[in-house]
Amino acid sequence: MKTSILFVIFSLALLFALSAATEIEETDRACGQFWWKCGEGKPPCCANFACKIGLYLCIWSP
């Protein structure tokens, strides 16, 4: 009984992870959001975000 419950839980977690990965792959974002790497060769930060020099991360800036 415990084994079947664990199997169902892990199966649902795997299904969720695969669907999230597919969603990210299909949206193909053209800009970097919060804590995304930025700089040379990387996509620019989205609106309301700025690339912080030294950290090279997109940080929210009003």
Swiss-Prot record:
Coiled coil residues, start to end: none
Cellular component annotations (GO), alphabetically ordered: extracellular region; host cell postsynaptic membrane; host cell presynaptic membrane
Tissue-specific expression: Expressed by the venom gland.
UniProt keyword list: Disulfide bond, Ion channel impairing toxin, Knottin, Neurotoxin, Postsynaptic neurotoxin, Potassium channel impairing toxin, Presynaptic neurotoxin, Secreted, Signal, Toxin, Voltage-gated potassium channel impairing toxin, Voltage-gated sodium channel impairing toxin
Predominant location: secreted
Removed propeptide positions: 22-29
Matching Pfam families: Toxin_12
Single GO MF annotation: potassium channel regulator activity
Secretion signal span: 1-21
Description of its domains: The presence of a 'disulfide through disulfide knot' structurally defines this protein as a knottin.
Family: Belongs to the neurotoxin 10 (Hwtx-1) family. 33 (Jztx-1) subfamily.
Purpose of the protein: Inhibits voltage-gated sodium channels, preferentially subtype Nav1.5/SCN5A (in cardiac myocytes), but also Nav1.6/SCN8A and Nav1.7/SCN9A (TTX-sensitive Nav in rat DRG neurons) and invertebrate Nav (in insect neurons) as well as voltage-gated potassium channels of the subtype Kv2.1/KCNB1. Is suggested to bind to site 3 of the sodium channels and inhibit the inactivation of the activated channels, thereby blocking neuronal transmission. On potassium channels, inhibits activation of channels with an IC(50) of 8.05 uM through a voltage sensor-trapping mechanism. Moderately inhibits voltage-gated sodium channels and weakly inhibits voltage-gated potassium channel. Inhibits the inactivation of rat Nav1.2/SCN2A (IC(50)=870 nM), rat Nav1.3/SCN3A (IC(50)=845 nM), rat Nav1.4/SCN4A (IC(50)=339 nM), human Nav1.5/SCN5A (IC(50)=335 nM) and human Nav1.7/SCN9A sodium channels (IC(50)=348 nM). The toxin delays the inactivation of sodium channels without affecting the activation and steady-state inactivation kinetics in the physiological range of voltages.
Name by which UniProt lists this protein: Delta-theraphotoxin-Cg1a 1
Lineage, top ranks: Eukaryota, Metazoa, Ecdysozoa, Arthropoda, Chelicerata
